[in-house]
Amino acid sequence: MKSLLVLFSYHHNNTEKIANVFEKVLDAQIKTPQQINPEKLQEYNLIGFGSGIYGGKHHKTLLDLADTLPQVTNRKAFIFSTSALTGKAKVAEDHSLLREKLQLKGYMIIDEFACKGFNTNSFLKYFGGMNKGRPNAEDLKHAEEFAQNLKQNLQ
């Protein structure tokens, strides 16, 4: 199974820490949105799209990439993120714009992953930030289990 992770990780590299776990389990390549040639994505069996959450959505570079993707048929993908706040409804909302863009292009979103990340944006920097130490060992373990499940379900 040939896998790719399209990652934009900024500030504290929270999402990159999660992507590194996925990379090992899925034997995947990691590329930034700027490194992607949309026409070459057909070479991959599974593509993960992830970034931190900014203003309730994935980073603009990831969303812009999704807009440029060619139409596909049932290409398997998953979405991942890190953010200051999580919870089932919050994650569903945060992932909704990227999910919709990918689905409109023909991608099947087979699963989604999110966890808390250290955040010092805005006024939080004056208080030492939020979620210091996240993603932590438990978050990384959950990321590994998530990737193992993806791998098993696709074989």
What is each residue range found by the language model?
Residues 3-4, 10, 16-17, 21-31, ...:
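FMN-binding flavodoxin-like domain, especially the glycine-rich phosphate-binding loop
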Residues 35-39:
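Short acidic active-site motifs
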